[in-house]
Amino acid sequence: MRELSAAKLLTEGVHPMEERSMTKAEKRCEWLTDKYILCLLALFPLFTGFHGYANLAAAKFWLYTGVTALWALGIAACLCTGARLFAKKPGAFFYLTCAFLVWNLVSAALSPWREKTFLGAGRYDGLFTQFLYALTALGIARWGRKKIIYVRVFGASVFLCCAVALWQIAGGNPLGLYPNGWRFADAGTLYSGMYLGTVGNTLILGSVLSLAVPVLVYTAVKKRGYDLLLLLPAAMALYVLYRSECSSAWVALPGSCALMLPKLARGRRRRYILAAEGA
């Protein structure tokens, strides 16, 4: 019996069909998804709204909601004109995502703060946001394509975010993100929490940069040429991680690097790595 890799098992049934079997409506779905991905990579990390860190979570939430709603409406229109929701029978990825949603529904139903679970009590990470995450994951798995431009756009976003963060570390307040004339150095004294860059608090910034570094370094080394410039935002990200005092990032960073290991292996060794990471 032929072996199937873990990656193929998880994505079976949600990857785009081959080009020759795609209808015009499905190609429009692919085009919309391409623009959706670019929009998220370019705008979401950098958008800060109009009230600085005081309202940053809400600004990013409504941006994500608006962009996702426009994309979903476009996809729905394409589905009404001939595009198929699945290229073939739904695979494990689809059912795992549905299980994720069911888990969130059960959690919300059993929560003693049930009335606050829909949006997330000011943090905007509630049930509605989890639904958007699932919609994004399934849509990109179905109509997304692997493109180098995505890494380049993400690298540009990381560069700009880190440039703002470095300015703040040096004592500045670009974009007026800190209120009342405060600075990054005032964290823990004049205000609670730590905020840096255009992402928000340093914990979230650390998670984003921890994911970015291995992706940017891998792409730069593999593609070479002008893509070696991606090493610049990667280096900036490492320095910002160090100065942000986000200790959890130094746990997340090795984990993110481990996720890149299957890209460096082939054949049986790659299957072993995928199995180990899945376990």
Residue ranges of predicted features:
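Juxtamembrane "helix-exit" motif on the non-cytosolic side of transmembrane helices
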Residues: 47-53, 107-116
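N-terminal membrane topogenic signal
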Residues: 21-37, 92
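Non-cytosolic membrane-interface motifs at loop->transmembrane helix junctions
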Residues: 117-127
